[in-house]
A protein has these predicted regions:
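Acidic, PIN/NYN-like endoribonuclease modules and their adjacent C-terminal/linker elements
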Residues: 1, 108-137
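Short, well-structured N-terminal submotif of metal-dependent ribonuclease cores
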Residues: 1-38, 53-62, 136-137
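Acidic active-site catalytic centers that drive phospho-/nucleotidyl reactions
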Residues: 5, 99, 118
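Residues that scaffold the ATP/ADP-binding catalytic core of kinase and kinase-like folds
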Residues: 11-13, 49, 124
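Active-site-proximal, substrate-binding regions of enzyme catalytic domains
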Residues: 47-72
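Active-site neighborhoods of divalent-metal-dependent phosphate/nucleic-acid chemistry enzymes
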Residues: 74-113
Length: 137
């Protein structure tokens, strides 16, 4: 099981430097070849960044609708308690809130590997960060 950070989706949606390997990785999740989690917060973060980059409501709707077709993706719905506990991760690991939410969710779901380009996760001893390229995409 993997956890997908929002920057993987953003690489594709914003056609950034790692867009092709990120897209190939996401296709593997979409087909059900790989199983992964993300959170509703991380999906919201993708939408906010897309909007800030000038993406239209149609682009956002297409992105959100596409998530319904991901056979290998589960979306964890955060509670206020998860968010409170994430502040402890912020304190203990020196992470910002969205990264702390990812780590908190990973711990709760017993997921050890995050797919991300964010090197801040490398500070968390028990988390293994992989890029799509590391996974062969």
């Amino acid at each position: 099981m993997l956890f997908i950070d929002s920057n993987i989706f953003l690489e594709v949606e914003l056609a950034q430097e790692h867009g092709v390997p990120a897209k190939n990785f996401l296709k593997a999740v979409q087909s059900g070849r790989l199983d992964a989690y993300t959170t509703d917060f991380h999906i919201d973060n993708v939408v906010i960044v897309m909007e800030n980059y000038g993406k239209s409501w149609r682009d956002i709707a297409v992105f959100l609708t596409s998530l319904l077709q991901y056979r290998g993706l589960s979306i964890y719905h955060l509670t206020i308690y998860d968010k409170i506990e994430a502040t402890e991760v912020m304190r203990d690991e020196g992470l910002d809130f969205d990264d702390a939410l990812a780590v908190r969710t990973m711990k709760k779901l017993n997921i050890k590997v995050i797919v991300s380009y964010d090197k801040d996760f490398d500070r968390v001893k028990w988390v293994k960060r992989k890029t799509p390229e590391d996974l062969g995409f």
